[in-house]
């Protein structure tokens, strides 16, 4: 401790297994660690944390702001048990109007903003983006096809026929007129919605005056589409151009943070977060820690409105400004429209937490009922449900969904592409054996046996208490065989769910090792619960299978040629029209394409000749 500097920095606490227990930052590392070492005046949470700590690591930073930024990054990477943790860390979707093309398209975008174009958002959910794009298609008739599809069109697609696209691909609209539609869409998404609507209304009136009722109807439908977008946005503030609004509510040992996004004076939606935090932490401490993690990988607006003052608010403001590259104001409004926005978010936080508490209570009763029904030693904390999906053995996949005390845990879902070539097409038993073997081999390798998890009852377990299989005695037998070969058959309870003779819901038969098949009463809540779990696994497996099948269907033969990337593929398809035409082309014809050298032309030619 004597060697620790009196500098700002970040420290990490580790337990005997090498797991990170806590990540913290300090203005003075030496003083902070000395405070821990005194061992008096600490809360129960800190006392437990110190008791489990066997070693610490330190990173010295130049400023406390740097320390705060590094702390947020390390918390998200290692997810320590004693820190406040965001449960849902998905990036937010944006609307992208592409650039660098004669006919820009409108798309949903998530992730790094590396593609050229104009980005609008963030939106609270992919559903909100989808609804907005759908309405903007009707209003501005912008294309949503990929560039490769656009370049190879020889006639308008169905979207043109149903008036969702103006078909710039086949010049049904001039580039100049299409650019006008793009400009209107940008203006609407930039907050100039009223001027765009006024322009469309004037055009509709002019068309009506000229007795051009067909065009007047087009303008009318476009106006209706824009009104539809705004009707789904709820409140649109008059005095707030760009802001994120955070409101926190705590009740029953749980926390809800409601976040609203306002951009260009428009409400782009909201999302409720339920961070994992010790019940001893107050709202100011939880909200402050949440803010630092929230903006670790997300752009920060110029204004952040809070329902209450957070700890180290000035330091957080400085850190957000540093990360964003512009001045950020963090405030707790006391009056006016900004105060109303915060109150609206707070109301939503209370309601969302109330619903979550009710769901959690109901879930606990169902888990206890499941334990009693199937003779489990305790209510399961982790349930895994498995299902397979394929068509005559093709594009076969296995799906695993996970549920626990708080419902479905979607970030734990896993998909398995069936790899084995020894499995007969359509052999569901063989597919299930492969899925279970791959899942539990990795589980044993990464986490060992479930015995060590008892030390950390607050963490979501990696080992399942129960696995549910969509199938009967044969499926359960296949699973038990694999688990037995791995020496872990006594660690997991396997239950098979088979539909009745008529495959009607409510007549399911259940299969367990050492028991006769049995059914549950038709109105049993546990039966409904298991049906919901099975249906979710079925939905996930089918969705995964469809995605794989779709990918297989759109795969282009040019993708198999080394050195042919998106740019060269697009150039070849634009010139020849189809991959089949490329396969028939002579080397001299291929060399006429920009980016195709003689060596590449021969590689393409030889690839198709060798088949």
UniProtKB/Swiss-Prot annotation:
Keywords: Cytoplasm, DNA damage, DNA excision, DNA repair, Excision nuclease, SOS response. It is found in: Cytoplasm. Gene3D superfamilies: 5' to 3' exonuclease, C-terminal subdomain (1.10.150.20), GIY-YIG endonuclease (3.40.1440.10), UVR domain (4.10.860.10), UvrC, RNAse H endonuclease domain (3.30.420.340). Residues 6-84 form the GIY-YIG domain. Residues 194-229 form the UVR domain. The keyword DNA-binding does not apply. Its main location: cytoplasm. Pfam families: GIY-YIG, HHH_5, UVR, UvrC_RNaseH, UvrC_RNaseH_dom. It comes from the Bacteria. The UvrABC repair system catalyzes the recognition and processing of DNA lesions. UvrC both incises the 5' and 3' sides of the lesion. The N-terminal half is responsible for the 3' incision and the C-terminal half is responsible for the 5' incision. Interacts with UvrB in an incision complex. NCBIfam families: PRK00558.1-5, uvrC. PANTHER family: UVRABC SYSTEM PROTEIN C, UVRC/OXIDOREDUCTASE. This is UvrABC system protein C. The lineage of its organism: Bacteria, Pseudomonadati, Pseudomonadota, Alphaproteobacteria, Hyphomicrobiales. The gene is uvrC.
